[in-house]
């Protein structure tokens, strides 16, 4: 016998051979057979396959392989009884073709017998089986759950974030408005009264530079309002003493030579030129009389007392001096009755008593004589000579104040 024979072929040969009727026999005409001596049949199968330890248990497990191939099946309720499924066709078929084409033949027969509804149900069953296997694969842990979550639920999370970002700007908008109001307040659009800081310096040279800086640091906006009024200044007015203690005849020691500066802030709509004189103050006759302000409304800075005998030059960028970026700028000019304080937006172009000035040799720091002519650089319409009388005398303090009161 051939060694390449299969188990079902081996059993079929035993049934067809009359010598082995005491081991295996047919029980019916439809292909049922019974193993009369199952252990002997198993030993014969072991001899064919060169397996000496073959027994019925191993033989029965080998027969189960043909259950799936639908070649042999076990008869239920009968021990050692089996049946060939396609009998007697199996006797006429090629043994090699039986195992290869048996499964395909069974599928074709089932398709022919099944109705169209059954076919559709079979297809749906296959689709459900595929989806079930996919879900089992996803939840088995072999597939990353992070990737599944990121693919299934990202749009909702992004929408929530976008709505939160759209709701946040209205809540933050009030602080932005508050910052804008602060900026408007700094630019003095709504503030009517501004107090000017006052700096006290020990030497006369620093005092001269400080007074010049304070006199020249006024904003261009206030100066533009005061330019029309500056043209209507007259030069005839009587002198009147403002303070008895500051009269030119009052003697003072040399170390107490001082310059008193009194600055009062006015509204931007009611500003007018100021007259300055040594020890006296007058009001221009061309200007209408102005009522005296109450004491509660007067905002004046403490006087700046500057002592010394020598008037020199000082750098305007000293940290002791106030910044002039947001302060008005006034300029002094000579009138027959005294010194007139006129506005001028020359904050960054005027050089006071510096070596860069074209009239530096004529500065009071180098010419100490009385009635020294001192010229500033080009002003509104030309050069304005300003005499500074009695700078070297001991009893000639100057009081600079606003014309808020009548002389």
UniProtKB/Swiss-Prot annotation:
Modified residues (Phosphoserine): 115, 396
Motif CTBP-binding motif per record, residues: 273-277
Keyword presence, Transferase: no
Cross-link Glycyl lysine isopeptide (Lys-Gly) (interchain with G-Cter in SUMO2): residue positions: 92, 165
Subcellular location: Nucleus
UniProt GO molecular function: DNA-binding transcription activator activity, RNA polymerase II-specific; DNA-binding transcription factor activity; DNA-binding transcription factor activity, RNA polymerase II-specific; DNA-binding transcription repressor activity, RNA polymerase II-specific; purine-rich negative regulatory element binding; RNA polymerase II cis-regulatory region sequence-specific DNA binding; sequence-specific double-stranded DNA binding
Cross-referenced Pfam families: Ets
Primary location: nucleus
SUPFAM superfamilies the record matches: Winged helix' DNA-binding domain
Family: Belongs to the ETS family.
Classification via PANTHER family: ETS, ETS DOMAIN-CONTAINING PROTEIN ELK-3
Subunit structure: Interacts with CTBP1.
Listed name of the protein: ETS domain-containing protein Elk-3
Species of origin: Homo sapiens (Human)
Name of encoding gene: ELK3
């Amino acid at each position: 016998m051939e060694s390449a024979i299969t188990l079902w072929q081996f059993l079929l040969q035993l049934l067809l051979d009359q010598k082995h009727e005491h081991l295996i026999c047919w029980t019916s005409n439809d292909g049922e057979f019974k193993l009369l001596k199952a252990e002997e049949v198993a030993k014969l199968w072991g001899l064919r396959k060169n397996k000496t330890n073959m027994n019925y248990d191993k033989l029965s497990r080998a027969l189960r392989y043909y259950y799936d191939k639908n070649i042999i099946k076990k008869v239920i309720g009968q021990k050692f009884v089996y049946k060939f499924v396609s009998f007697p066709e199996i006797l006429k078929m090629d043994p090699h073709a039986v195992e290869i084409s048996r499964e395909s033949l069974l599928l074709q027969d089932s398709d022919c017998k099944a109705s169209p509804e059954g076919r559709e149900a079979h297809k749906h069953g296959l689709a459900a089986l595929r989806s079930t296997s996919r879900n089992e694969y996803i939840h088995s842990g072999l597939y990353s759950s992070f990737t599944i979550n990121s693919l299934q639920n990202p749009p909702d999370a992004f929408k929530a974030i976008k709505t939160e970002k759209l709701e946040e700007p209205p809540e933050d908008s009030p602080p932005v408005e508050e910052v804008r109001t602060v900026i408007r307040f700094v630019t003095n659009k709504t503030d009517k009264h501004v107090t000017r800081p006052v700096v006290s310096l020990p030497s006369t040279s620093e005092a001269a530079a400080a007074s010049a800086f304070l006199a020249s640091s006024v904003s261009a906006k206030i100066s533009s309002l005061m330019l029309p009024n500056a043209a209507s200044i007259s030069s005839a007015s009587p002198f009147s003493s403002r303070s008895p203690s500051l009269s030119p005849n009052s003697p003072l020691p040399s170390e107490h030579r001082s310059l008193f500066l009194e600055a009062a802030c006015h509204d931007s709509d009611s500003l007018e030129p100021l007259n300055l004189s040594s020890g006296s103050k007058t009001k221009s006759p061309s200007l209408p009389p102005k009522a005296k302000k109450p004491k509660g409304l007067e905002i004046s800075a403490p006087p700046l007392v500057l002592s010394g005998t020598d008037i020199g030059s000082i750098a305007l960028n000293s940290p002791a001096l106030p910044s002039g970026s947001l302060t008005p700028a006034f300029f002094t000019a000579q009138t027959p009755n005294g010194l007139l304080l006129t506005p001028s937006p020359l904050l960054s172009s005027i050089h006071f008593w510096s070596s860069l000035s074209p009239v530096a040799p004529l500065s009071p720091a180098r010419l100490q004589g009385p009635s020294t002519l001192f010229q500033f650089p080009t002003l509104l319409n030309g050069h304005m000579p300003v005499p500074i009388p009695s700078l070297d005398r001991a009893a000639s303090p100057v009081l600079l104040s606003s014309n808020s009161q009548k002389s």
